[in-house]
Amino acid sequence: VATMKRHSTSIAITSAFEAFAMVDPKTVLRNLDELRSLTSDEHGAQRVAWTPVWLKARAWFEEKLKSLPVEHHYDSAANHWMTLKGESEKTLVIGSHLDSVPNGGWLDGCLGVLAGLEVLTSFAKEYNGKPPYTMRLVDWADEEGARFGRSLFGSSAFAGSHTIDADRVRTDREGTTLEAALQGCGVDVDRIGESCREQKNIAAYLELHIEQGPILEKLQKPLAVVQGTKGVERWAITFHGQEAHSGSTPMAARRDALAAAAKLALEIRPIARKHSQSVATMGSVKTFPGIVTAVVGRCETTLDMRDLDAGILAEMLREAREASERFAGEERCSVEWSKIWSIEPIPFHPDLIQLCEEAIVETAGVSEQLPSGPLHDAAEVARIGIPTVMMFVQSLNGLSHNRAEDTNRAHIEQAVIAFNRLAQKTIGCWTQHP
């Protein structure tokens, strides 16, 4: 599945498809508004995976399928698959996710799912329920990893890169294990690997997503082709010192675990700034005993590092580890590292990148190519050799993962039209070169 034939005649070939399968972007906007009103509060979206609100969103989405000639089911990893059977078993998959971070935005993930639903709907109408190739839409389970720190849960199970033994004992802030949360949603953790069965006949994967950054707005461009996703190293780091009374312990006698962690939090900034596309974040800090009258005896932190270059990513990680040991020594503490998750940089398929470029230019008149810093399910799909590409739509003020997340509604409409064109072009290539 790793090769797609690409020829200069593809634009002419796909023009016939563009006379059909017309999407209605306003339907996508109405559905987005409806989902927001159903699953958000004054703080933002609350569709955190493995929670009642997430299940409510999925039940709402199931209602949207009742008028379509699609089969739908949940696989062993709780990914929701919708299939519009075609004349051929060769399959185009469109995917994204309905889950959100706590207090999240109204577009992250769900835009791709609802745009995909509209593309499926349009093809079903124009081909009387049976397009030339099979089309599938997938709502991946727990893309965000917000509750347990394990991103891309469902798509990594699909790709065969997820080992549940390393994750079943992960806990959320309330102490609930990942295994217990999954069981509460009807998922048998020992059967998650069976999700790989869904790979059969998939020849390409497409995903539409908001940019979640400031670049497109700065360039005054509505849409972009995504070149690939950055590699990620995600670690839990714990500094161990000595709890002591804050009033009676001299400064020179303290073994302050938080002081060591704070030094590392500052040090990762210059480590990342050495490289133009690198980022590093310490996004979580827990102190123990966590009271105002005690020196911190234990400090638990997380580190997230990303870059497109695997060598640079490894160098950054090495420098961060060395710095943590140095700062632990300075504060007379110890430090331990525990890996949460990692993924290598993933380039997307060059032929699909070209088709995506064409679809964007034909829709918006101008395009851009960007790497993706945020993680996406598309990376897990691409890493197993399925030709993959993503399309970005501009984010306002570069904000995401909070209630201020927004995109110009006209740009959303353009994105839906361009994404539909991309699906048409992909199938057009297959029609010419089956």
Protein language model regions, located:
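A non-catalytic alpha/beta surface segment that caps or lines the substrate-entry region
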Residues: S40-K85
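His/Asp/Glu-rich mid-to-C-terminal helical/loop segments that flank catalytic regions of hydrolases
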Residues: Q227, H245, T249-K274, L317, ...
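Alpha-helical metal-binding/catalytic segments enriched in His/Glu/Asp
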Residues: I94, N103-E144, E233-F239, H245-I271, ...
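A short beta-alpha structural unit
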Residues: Q46-W50, T281-G290, T302-L308, S334-I353, ...
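Active-site-adjacent substrate-binding region
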Residues: L29, S37-L38, T176-Q227, A265-P270, ...
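Zn-dependent metallopeptidase/amidohydrolase metal-coordination segment
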Residues: V28-L38, L92-S96, G297, S367-R421
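Midchain, well-structured core segments that form catalytic/ion-binding scaffolds
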Residues: D142-E143, R147-A310
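N-terminal capping segment at the start of a domain
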Residues: I11-P52, L399-S400
